[in-house]
Amino acid sequence: EQKTALGIELGSTRIKAVLIGADNAPIASGDHEWENRYDNGVWTYTLEDIWTGLQDAYTKMAADVKEKYDITLTRVGAIGFSAMMHGYMAFDKAGNLLVPFRTWRNNITEEASEKLTDLFGFHIPQRWTIAHLYQAILNGEPHVADIDYVTTLAGYIQWKMTGERVVGVGEASGIFPIDSETNTYFADMIAKFDEAVADKAYSWKALDVLPHVLTAGDNAGVLTKEGAALLDMSGNLEAGIPLCPP
């Protein structure tokens, strides 16, 4: 079991859980089909959609293991999550989602996209997380003052699984421009962003609320008891399994 790895991908129409062995060949899998919903002018998935979908895909994968090998899955060697990039999930200090998840499909940030592209001298597509954040600021949305964490779907799941507010550098490149010399956000652009919103007098700066950027092989946390309980409804999955950067 220590030589296995579990990969879970949250695509736009399907959530897939695949367990592989030491030779990287699939051992077992499970999936769950889902659809985004158009709600109040926003393409979204609810938190319930996310967790019931993840749990269903995991349960089917674990059942596949049981059926094929007569083993109750309690541990795997490692876990990795990936999900549709970009979009906007904003949370307060208590971990509450402040507004419904705004997915990559939304084209509601044109003003922010243009202004940030000019400010940074770097193309910022509408779907990027920072465009969503800046558009919420430009709109005067009251939730922005209460933000403690802004992340993507993969970043959210990693946080719930491990308690770590981290993403891999690939995921981060759809959040905010990445400096390939430092493998993190461009420091000068972060400073420009903070300066551009300084007149709002928020209690946070950009680096306070964005996920920390990791590269492949970096420690991205381990599965907590709470995370294991969220993923595996049977309660068989044990805590302590390492996760890679999402």
Name each region found by the language model.
Residues 5, 50-52, 129:
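N-terminal start-of-chain detector that recognizes signal peptides
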Residues 5, 10-48, 96-103:
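Short glycine-rich, Thr/Ser-proximal phosphate-binding strand/loop in the N-terminal lobe
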Residues 30-71, 115, 121:
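N-terminal phosphate-binding loop and adjacent alpha-helix
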Residues 59-246:
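Glycine-rich phosphate-binding/catalytic subdomain of phosphoryl-transfer
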